[in-house]
Amino acid sequence: MAAYLLAVAILFCIQGWPLGTVQGQVMPFMEVYRHSVCQPRETLVSILEEYPGEIAHIFRPSCVTALRCGGCCTDESLECTATGKRSVGREIMRLSPHKGTSEKEVMQFTEHTDCECRPRSASGVNSRKHKRNPEEGEQRAKFPFV
C-alpha cells in the first residue's frame, strides 16, 4: 500500500512539471524566446463567446481548441495580430434542454494561420492604459451590470 501511495505521489509531482524539462533545469534563452514570439497558438475558445446567439443550448465540450495569434512583440506599441485566417470544423454535442434533445453537429470556428506584430489601434492603446471613470464623463450601467 505504501508503494502505491508513493507511486501516486510521484505521478502527481511529475505531472506538475513543464513538458520537456526536469525539475530544477533552466530552459535556455533561445527556447524561451522561440516560445514567446507572436505566432498561432493552440487556444481554448468558448463556444458561447463565438456563438452568443446560442445561449438556449448547452454544448459539450463548452470550449474547443483553435489556433489563435498570441505572444510577445518587441514593442508595447505593437500587438500580435492575425494576418491569415481559415475556417475549421469541430464536432460538438448540442443539448437542447427545452426540447429534451441532444445531437452531434459540426460547428465552424475561425483559426489563425499567420500572425504579425502590428501597431495597436488608437482605441486599443487608450483602453489598456487608462480606464475612464464616471467623473470623467463615462456613463456606466447600473447594477447588475458593473
From Swiss-Prot:
Pfam families: PDGF
Disulphide linkage map: C38-C80, C69-C115, C73-C117
InterPro entries per UniProt: Cystine-knot_cytokine, PD_growth_factor_CS, PDGF/VEGF_dom, PDGF/VEGF_growth_factor
One GO process term, biological-process aspect: positive regulation of angiogenesis
Tissue: Expressed by the venom gland.
GO cellular component terms given for this protein: extracellular space; membrane
Single annotated GO MF: growth factor activity
Region Disordered, annotated ranges: 118-146
Signal peptide from the UniProt entry: 1-24
Pyrrolidone carboxylic acid sites (modified residues): Q25
Main location: secreted
Keyword terms, alphabetized: Disulfide bond, Growth factor, Pyrrolidone carboxylic acid, Secreted, Signal, Toxin
Biased composition annotated in UniProt, kind: Basic and acidic residues: 133-146
Subcellular location: Secreted
Function in brief: Snake venom VEGFs that may contribute to venom dispersion and prey subjugation by inducing vascular permeability and hypotension. This protein induces an increase in capillary permeability after intradermal injection, as well as a drastic hypotensive effect after intravenous injection. The hypotension is mediated by nitric oxide (NO), which is produced by VEGF-activated endothelium NO synthase. Also induces angiogenesis in vitro. Like other crotalid VEGFs, this protein interacts with VEGF receptor-1 (FLT1) with a high affinity, whereas it binds to VEGF receptor-2 (KDR) with a low affinity.
Assembly description: Homodimer; disulfide-linked. Interacts with VEGF receptor-1 (FLT1) with a high affinity, whereas it binds to VEGF receptor-2 (KDR) with a low affinity. Does not bind VEGF receptor-3 (FLT4).
Family the entry assigns: Belongs to the PDGF/VEGF growth factor family. Snake venom VEGF subfamily.
Protein name: Snake venom vascular endothelial growth factor toxin
